[in-house]
């Protein structure tokens, strides 16, 4: 279906997921996984790009830490420290280095949009989505801002668009 939409509906982008997405609750149908291995994903992205006469946005949600669609268990080299770990070390050069590793991997695969960094503040210690998954650099806005800036700069070097979230 996505191929038809790219060709016939002139959509301008896709987002890649490593998990099956429920498409029909009633029938319990799921999409097939679209991230299996580095070679498979690179080939898939090339095929998708050939379908459109326009430059497509090929997006992923690759923050690092627990939020990784490109895990080392599938052969990818993008796995990095979590935002929380980076914020605790409070070394923006390290954050840049870790984000650069992600950006290099995305660039190599042909991905040009990353739904990251997460710029939420770690103020709710009970949050199962942000705090418990270590997705925030800190509970202090200044720390979050300077690490987010380093993260974004690393992606800019590879012309990977970033989407700061969930504020």
Segments and roles (model prediction):
Residues 146, 154:
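Histidine/acidic residue-rich metal-binding segments in metalloenzymes
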